[in-house]
């Protein structure tokens, strides 16, 4: 674990110290590069550091974190995770992504309110300082439309139907 950095340390360091640290960091990053005739490329993770794959089934989608909130939105909630897993299953066909997609859809559906026959909605509390203010947003990025679009994307992935991409996965179509 890194030692605590105190303000006194910054007073003792010079501009040359920071420059040397920047150069050392750049040289270290360069050791991770794969040299090709066209230049250098970097793997997403260095060899042997793909342990994140073991963490995904432990924490997503049932447990939440600072980046994955207990909310129904595309940016940081269950709808966005479902959109990701459905797209990855659609593009790769891997059973791992299929399992994540189904688990996430189950969690999203269990978080919904369907007491009115034929209707389903999701509620959120966005005001951390007013936890009693709970609302159902209709929006695509934050709200019911986004939840429904992720479920629709899941359906399309399961049935092989093509949908217009609503989010950032449009660049995969080039490959």
What annotation goes with each model-predicted range?
Residues 1-175:
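Glycan-recognition and catalytic cores of secretory/periplasmic carbohydrate-active enzymes
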